[in-house]
Regions:
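Conserved short histidine dyad/triad with adjacent acidic residue
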Residues: 48-68, 96-98, 102, 106-107
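Glycine- and acidic-residue-biased ligand/ion/polar-headgroup-sensing regions
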Residues: 58-61, 67-88
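Extracellular/periplasmic catalytic domains that process cell-envelope and extracellular macromolecules
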Residues: 31-34, 45-47, 67-68, 75, ...
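A short, N-terminal "cap"/entry segment at the start of jelly-roll beta-barrel domains
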Residues: 1-49, 138-147
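Short beta-strand His + acidic residue motifs that chelate non-heme Fe in jelly-roll/DSBH
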Residues: 63-65, 83-84, 105, 110-116
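Double-stranded beta-helix
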Residues: 92-95, 112-147
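Short acidic-glycine-tyrosine-enriched beta hairpin
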Residues: 44, 81, 87-108
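Divalent metal-coordination and catalytic microenvironments
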Residues: 41, 100, 122
Length: 147
């Protein structure tokens, strides 16, 4: 079954099938940073309805403070994700989330993240459409705009 199905139904994907799905740093709901890839596992984050994406973030990456219009829930799949809430990146506000950790990205609540020495995979689900808006427009990755 296609991963981009827009209706809830039966879905079974192996890791190889997830890796084969659409990817890029310019996907809707992604940070827009070069090197960060987003794979759509289910649904379409640009449209109304349930979606799930997998965010792959390289080691030593900082994602500045940003928001999304929708409420999102996330699970850290691999690596340690350092995540915090606030209008500006603040290393003191980060909480280290190892694999299996769960966190929320409430709609319009500013948050930020960072990876350490290892890459991180995070599975994020929400009810679209979603977007990404940086709190400080100067932190918006070049060419990213609002995604």
């Amino acid at each position: 079954q296609a991963a981009s199905s827009s209706t809830l139904g039966q879905l079974r994907l192996t890791p190889a099938e997830v890796r084969a799905n659409q990817s890029g740093s310019d996907q809707i709901g992604s940070s827009g940073l070069a090197g960060v890839s987003t794979k759509v596992v289910f649904g379409d984050p640009s449209k109304s309805g349930f979606y799930t994406i997998v965010l792959s973030v390289p080691a030593h990456t900082t994602i500045q403070a940003h928001t999304h219009r929708d409420d999102r829930m996330a699970v850290v799949v691999s690596g340690t994700w350092h995540f915090g809430y606030g209008d500006h990146f603040d290393e003191r506000a980060l909480k280290s989330l190892p694999p299996g950790s769960v966190y929320s990205e409430p709609g319009a609540v500013t948050h930020f993240a960072q990876t350490g020495a290892e890459p991180v995979l995070v599975e994020i689900s929400g009810f679209g459409p979603t977007d990404t808006r940086y709190f400080d427009p100067a932190n918006t990755p070049k060419g990213a705009g609002d995604r």
